[in-house]
Amino acid sequence: MATVKLSFLQHICKLTGLSRSGRKDELLRRIVDSPIYPTSRVLGIDLGIKNFSYCFASQNEDSKVIIHNWSVENLTEKNGLDIQWTEDFQPSSMADLSIQLFNTLHEKFNPHVILMERQRYRSGIATIPEWTLRVNMLESMLYALHYAEKRNSIEQKIQYPFLLSLSPKSTYSYWASVLNTKASFSKKKSRVQMVKELIDGQKILFENEEALYKWNNGSRVEFKKDDMADSALIASGWMRWQAQLKHYRNFCKQFLKQ
């Protein structure tokens, strides 16, 4: 184990979205044993009710991200996902919203992997904002639906999509490091600028012009561009992690034999 430095393994973990804490042997085993997921049909989600953002994308042979469908929707009114829901936050009504959303996303995109931005449970103030609780409720219901369906698929021996929870701080800080941005990634304008740089640098490509049109004309329609940026950063960052994990995992296997 002396032939590989701890700092090098920590750097690999940073490039692959893995935790950097632990001893050398722990990091090495983490890199080698972490699963590699398919990147052909990936759905990145920035969860919200009036600002539900999604980015459906894939990765080509050059590890570049190709966006197929990208938008942000207000689920309380007429929307592009055809969710029909009255703004009512009682558990029964939220369950109806969750089922509609769950079924629509699976039927519309048939994703192999779903990435959901992890919601916060603490706001740093004495009282938790009501909207935070509502979105947390939606998040929990979507997870419950997923694992119920996953259990059924296992019993029927059917392949079912993976659902992964991603820390927004991890994906945003990763892209801030890659793009060498000096602005704080916690600021919405900074994340919008990050996506703009990824598009201008052709690290993000588009299958069609519709998604790019929505992005370029965001100021003319009723959605916030920062929410749209977040789902793209989640999807593109995670797929880049996967490509690098595949590369470094094979490289690190040699050190396990020493």
Swiss-Prot record:
- The intrachain disulfides are none
An example GO CC term for this entry is:
mitochondrion
- Mitochondrion listed as a keyword: yes
- What InterPro entries does UniProt report for this protein, alphabetically? Mrs1/Cce1, RNaseH-like_sf, RNaseH_sf, SAP_dom, SAP_dom_sf, Ydc2_cat
**Where is this protein found?**
Mitochondrion
EC nos: 3.1.21.10
Gene3D superfamilies annotated for this entry? Answer: Ribonuclease H-like superfamily/Ribonuclease H
Q: Which GO terms describe its biological process?
A: mitochondrial DNA metabolic process; mitochondrial genome maintenance
- What biological function has been recorded for the protein in this entry? Capable of resolving Holliday junctions. Specific for 4-way junctions. Seems to be important for the maintenance of mitochondrial DNA. Cleaves fixed junctions at the point of strand exchange. Cleaves after 5'-CT-3' and 5'-TT-3' sequences.
| Single Gene Ontology MF annotation | Y-form DNA binding
> What does the entry list as the binding residues for Mg(2+)?
D46, D230
Q: Which reaction does it catalyse?
A: Endonucleolytic cleavage at a junction such as a reciprocal single-stranded crossover between two homologous DNA duplexes (Holliday junction)
Pfam families annotated for this entry?
Ydc2-catalyt
Q: Which organism is it from?
A: Schizosaccharomyces pombe (strain 972 / ATCC 24843)
Q: State the top-level EC class.
A: hydrolase
Q: What is this protein called?
A: Cruciform cutting endonuclease 1, mitochondrial
Please report the stretch or stretches of sequence annotated as the SAP domain.
Answer: 1-35
Assembly behavior: Homodimer.
Keywords noted in UniProt = Endonuclease, Hydrolase, Magnesium, Metal-binding, Mitochondrion, Nuclease, Transit peptide
Q: Which gene encodes it?
A: cce1
